Design a protein with these regions (language model features):
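Substrate-binding/active-site clefts of carbohydrate-active enzymes
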Residues: 1-64, 68-94, 114, 158
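Conserved alpha/beta catalytic core and glycan-binding cleft of carbohydrate-active enzymes
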Residues: 63, 84-185
Length: 185
């Protein structure tokens, strides 16, 4: 959106105060844990409805069978705190249409407390950056065979505590952020 005085490109034109999280004592500045200049307030009823209606539309009209949520921890925020039982995660997990599609979280945001690998509730699955880092280090001779085996077997140290299976881990080596595979090896 270009900041509070910039042009309106997205939600700002609909409900600027309601759709974006605010910071400061007067609430006149955007609060940003995404690195994009603002953070959608998924606890706002209107914003949550827009998100859910949009997702349902893609599922029912175009038969999309899953979604990946970039910086998904930002959507789990209630104020500045993270609430894994909050409005967005609870509602999407109980939705009669959306609970049956694949829900993939990039389980972090751009803040120090937003790293939530292994914390998203079912039916969510998560990008596993611990796997990513272990594979990259293994190629460089920096990861033990035991660590690599743990990652290949589903990272139970991250997902088994809450009863989730290895399927909760989405293993990847490179993605849209960062280096290409060629740059890494």
């Amino acid at each position: 959106e270009g900041g509070p005085d910039g042009p309106a490109y997205s939600f700002r034109g609909l409900d600027d105060v309601g759709f974006y999280k605010r910071s400061g004592t007067t609430g006149d500045a955007y609060w940003d844990v995404t690195g994009c200049g603002n953070t959608v307030d998924a606890t706002n009823v209107g914003a949550l409805r827009l998100i859910l209606d949009s997702l349902r539309y893609w599922v029912t009209e175009f038969h999309v069978d899953g979604f990946r949520f970039d910086l998904a921890s930002a959507l789990a925020r209630n104020g500045h705190d993270i609430d894994m039982a909050g409005a967005f995660l609870t509602t999407i997990g109980q939705d009669p249409v959306l609970r049956y599609v694949k829900l993939i979280a990039e389980p972090w945001d751009a803040s120090m407390d937003g790293y939530l690998v292994g914390s998203f509730p079912p039916p969510w699955v998560e990008w596993n950056d611990t796997y990513r880092d272990a594979v990259r280090d293994f190629w460089r001779g920096r990861t033990s065979p035991r660590e690599m085996a743990s990652r290949l077997a589903g990272s139970s140290d991250l997902y088994a505590d809450d009863g989730r299976s290895p399927y909760a881990s989405v293993n990847f080596v490179t993605a849209h952020d960062g280096f290409t595979l060629r740059d890494l090896v």
